């Protein structure tokens, strides 16, 4: 809808953990820090932070700006492990998510006014995608599966690093 929107999703389940609109047509590498910051803020209740970001080649050279996150892209082919090489192939999983946001969740056109409206629209489209994802999982796994997750204390749940796939 005229601005660049960055999407961050989890490694498993492709749940969107960050959606941010960037105005002024910025370079991809200059948007990564803000995108990771938003994903960290939105996941603060889960005590998990993005540890690794699998990105495309537009994010080359931003390793020094983000020392807390390991940035993996195709340009580092000789320096990445075999596991990271396999996970890098999964980076393409963000493309269908972006397609669904544009086609099914009305991200193709924003009817809200101004920069604030664009930012709000991106987050609301991502929230709609996540609600649809959650309803699909409830239908697939059953209501009792999710009810257990809400009543189990947070200290007993296993937590690990969240891998973010960043795409535009």
Feature map (PLM): residue ranges:
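Polybasic low-complexity intrinsically disordered regions
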Residues: 1-50, 64
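Active-site proximal loops enriched in glycine and acidic residues that flank catalytic Cys/His/Asp
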Residues: 5, 9-11, 18-23, 35-36, ...
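Generic, well-ordered alpha-helical scaffold segments in large soluble proteins
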Residues: 10, 35-42, 97-100, 104, ...
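Composition- and surface-driven signal marking solvent-exposed, interaction-prone regions
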Residues: 19-22, 33, 66-68, 112-115, ...
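Helix-centered, glycine/charged polyanion-binding patches within enzymatic domains
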Residues: 44-120
């Amino acid at each position: 809808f005229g601005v660049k929107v960055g999407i961050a999703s989890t490694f498993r389940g492709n749940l969107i953990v960050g959606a941010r609109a960037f105005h002024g047509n910025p370079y991809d590498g200059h948007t990564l820090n803000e995108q990771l910051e938003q994903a960290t803020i939105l996941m603060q209740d889960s005590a998990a932070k993005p540890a690794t970001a699998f990105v495309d080649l537009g994010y080359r050279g931003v390793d020094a700006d983000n020392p807390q996150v390991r940035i993996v892209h195709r340009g580092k082919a000789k320096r990445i492990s075999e596991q990271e090489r396999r996970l890098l192939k999964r980076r393409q999983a963000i493309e269908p998510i972006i397609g669904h946001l544009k086609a099914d969740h009305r991200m193709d056109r924003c009817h809200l006014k101004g920069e604030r409206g664009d930012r709000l629209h991106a987050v609301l489209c991502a929230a709609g995608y996540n609600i649809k994802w959650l309803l699909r999982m409830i239908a697939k796994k059953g209501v009792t599966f999710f009810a257990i997750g809400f009543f189990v204390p947070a200290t007993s749940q296993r937590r690990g690093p969240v891998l973010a796939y960043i795409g535009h």
